[in-house]
Design a protein with these regions (language model features):
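Short, charged, intrinsically disordered terminal tails
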Residues: 54-67
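Amphipathic, hydrophobic secondary-structure cores in small proteins
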Residues: 12-57
Length: 67
C-alpha cells in the first residue's frame, strides 16, 4: 500500500499543475486504470482524488491542520 504522504504529494503536484481541474484529471486517471483492469491503480487514483479534494477544501474549522 502506498503511504498517505506519497498520495498527498501526488495530489499536491496535480493541484499545482491543473489547479481547480485537478480532481477531474485524477478521476480520469482512475477511470483509465479501471478500463485497463488495473484495480490497484484505480484505488490509488481514487485516494489521490480524495486527497486533492481535501487540499482544495476551503471550509476548515479554525485550528484544523491539513495533514
Amino acid at each position: 500500500m502506498i503511504p498517505d504522504l506519497d498520495i498527498f504529494r501526488s495530489a499536491n503536484v496535480l493541484v499545482k499543475q491543473h489547479g481547480q481541474d485537478a480532481p477531474i484529471h485524477a478521476a480520469m486517471r482512475a477511470d483509465a486504470m479501471l478500463e485497463k483492469g488495473d484495480l490497484e491503480g484505480q484505488v490509488v487514483w481514487k485516494r489521490i482524488v480524495r486527497a486533492v479534494e481535501e487540499i482544495q477544501r476551503t471550509d476548515r474549522p479554525s485550528g484544523e491542520v491539513l495533514q
